[in-house]
Amino acid sequence: MDPVQQKIKQQVESNPIVLYMKGSPDFPQCGFSMRVSQALKACGQPFTHVNVLEDADIREGIKVYGNWPTIPQLYVKGQLVGGCDITMDLYESGDLQKMLQEAVGG
């Protein structure tokens, strides 16, 4: 596994909830990242974010790691949940809140 993939694997496995996004939750740099980060904040569980705009290797590497072509990408307990559409569907159904609560042991 190359160093970028190893770094991503470490990030995903050492944090229960990780959002790979453009920008930060307070200053998102794209509408899709903004929507997902707002949904996560509304769920009330702490989450880690990685700003892919700060590291081109991570920005391209996360697409390979998750076999998912777009950003944002949400990982919960080491597994890719999906991008904006899937995350928003889960949020609107109430399933995201349950998933995140279980991930942090609540």
Where does each model-flagged region fall?
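N-terminal organelle transit peptides
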Residues: M1-V4
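Thiol/disulfide oxidoreductase modules built on the thioredoxin-like
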Residues: V64-T70
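Thiol-based oxidoreductase modules, predominantly thioredoxin-like and allied folds used
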Residues: Q45-E60
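Non-catalytic, surface beta->alpha helical segment in thiol-disulfide oxidoreductase systems
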Residues: V76-G105
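Acidic beta-strand-to-loop metal/phosphate-binding motif
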Residues: Y20, Q73-K77
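Short secondary-structure boundary/capping segments
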Residues: K9-Q10, M88
